[in-house]
Amino acid sequence: HRCTFCIIPFARGNNRSLAMGAIADQVRALVAKGYREVVLTGVDICSYGTDLPGNPTLGHLVRRLLKAVPELERLRLSSLDPAAMDDELFRALAEEARLMPHLHLSLQAMDDMVLKRMKRRHSRDDAYKVAERARALRPDLVLGADLIAGFPTETQAMHDNTLAAVRDLDLVHLHVFPYSERDGTPAARMPTVDVPERKARAAELRDAGAANLARFLATSIGQTVPVLIERDAMG
């Protein structure tokens, strides 16, 4: 898939999936070295398997890894395209306790016209439905998202739609980027938003995410849950 703002496909070419057995071997080796959590990552992990025999999906890979490496304590997923999450992945989310209750969605925007001009495959309503379905299966689920602020042609009203969705969906972990032109991409030829306005809109989105995170942390006070300490530092 090629979004209008993204230069990555031009640099990296088409997706190339590792065989499930090879991934399981890598995870098994990491666990043997003492790693307790593995994060599956890639340019577009929801497209996993489209170039492999039998077309296994990301959901099938998750199931295979958790079965093949029972010693793995925690499996986490990196950024997910909400238009390409398969049914097996949702079933794994509901049934596999070792799959972390955290989904990071590659939303980029939450206004339908902006999404269309980005050439994204999901609509605003699609994203809401994905969040609703996932939370129904996993009530303790935490959602994050990637967002681009000030995409070409984005009006204040379009930005406000994205800002409202951050609050509606209670997105607590945001990766927000002011739009940055990439030569050779279709978006670079579109009418632009002034750079200071892009930065201001990005700050608004980050502030909304920070407020959501503060509320989430407040609800966690008094709970006892297993955690993974990642570094020797406070905070």
Where are these regions (language model features)?
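Canonical Radical SAM [4Fe-4S] cluster-binding loop centered on the CxxxCxxC motif
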Residues: 1-21
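Conserved, mostly hydrophobic/aromatic
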Residues: 3, 23, 40, 77, ...
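Conserved SAM/AdoMet-binding glycine-rich loop
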Residues: 32-157
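Short, ordered loop/turn segments at secondary-structure junctions
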Residues: 11, 43-45, 179
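Terminal RNA-binding accessory module
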Residues: 181, 189-235
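C-terminal, non-catalytic macromolecule-binding modules
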Residues: 137, 157, 161-206
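Aromatic/hydrophobic pocket-lining residues that form the small-molecule binding cavity
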Residues: 23, 58, 127, 159-162, ...
